Amino acid sequence: MRPQAAHRATLTALTALAPVSWGTTYAVTTEFLPPDRPLFTGLLRALPAGLLLLALARVLPRGAWWWKSVVLGALNIGAFFPLLFLSAYRLPGGMAAVVGSVGPLFVVGLSALLLGQRPSPRTLLTGVAAAFGVSLVVLQAAGALDVLGVLAAFASTASMSAGIVLTKRWGRPEGVGPLALTGWQLTAGGLLIAPLAVLVEGAPPALDGRAVGGYLYLALANTAVAYWLWFRGIGRLTATQATFLGPLSPLTAAVVGWAALGQTLTPVQLAGMALAFGATVAGQIGPRRKPSGSEAVRGTSGGPVLGSPGRKAPRDPMDVTGQGVTGPALRR
């Protein structure tokens, strides 16, 4: 293998560790953490990681980016994390993760509304196919799945999708890297979760060694390190390569649920998962023409899109999912 190809393969493998890590969130939540504490869990995942990234980046927001960071932090972290963990507490990991594959449809609709980007027929078809695959999974398991958990999973996906589209609309400040912008959002989101966690869930629960280990894993490996690897890769890989890695998160969740937790999936549900993942990947890795210089996306401050300085914006709004919507998207 040539040195350049070997370097690219190594970079891709390291970047892929981020969505793989995010796919373990559901199993860690249900097996290691105190039950029914979605706000507390979201707080301990977001705030320590955000403060760590702020210490590493040593850059604070300026001007309008104070309130923009709060808005993005609320959508990408403050609302997303609690809803994500609520769904993780109430749904099997594979089920909760696959709901996130409807995210491209949310992104398409919000991109048309906020960015004026008209989706192509291929984008709409693949988005509908992904949603149909999700419906096969959810409807086939209607008797076993918790309604509140399903609603929380959809709401978390919608929240992250809105955050991704606004991130694309605003770009990032001149001279600020993705690590700093991620730190701003994690810190803002964690600070927003903190008072809600106290008001709704009361005092923090007593933690045993198992829970402490779970929280350390979520804050450090699953969030701080995973986000660093993700945005480092986003800046060096093409958009197609980055978005192709996204389905690794729900796939990991489903595999971990089956292999380690004894969860089962019916043949129809497996077909739905395959359809959803396949449609999402097909919509993101299809051939795209290179955009002209006039199509470069910059925010109001003139900065490029998060995670890829100077990157040109594709006309297909599906491409913005390459910003890390699974992950963190979290599921990510």
Predicted feature locations:
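Specific alpha-helical transmembrane segments that line the substrate/conduction pathway
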Residues: 40-51, 76, 81-118, 122-127, ...
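Cytoplasmic-side transmembrane-helix entry/capping segments in multi-pass membrane proteins
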Residues: 65-74, 119-130, 149-153, 175-185, ...
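Juxtamembrane helix-entry segments on the extracytoplasmic side of multipass membrane proteins
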Residues: 7-11, 34-39, 43, 62-67, ...
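Helix-helix packing/entry segments at the starts of transmembrane helices
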Residues: 42-44, 96-104, 166-190, 220-259
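Glycine-/small-residue-enriched transmembrane alpha-helix faces in small-molecule transporters
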Residues: 1-43, 132, 142-169, 191-192, ...
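Hydrophobic transmembrane alpha-helices of multi-pass small-molecule transport proteins
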Residues: 53, 110, 119-139, 157-160, ...
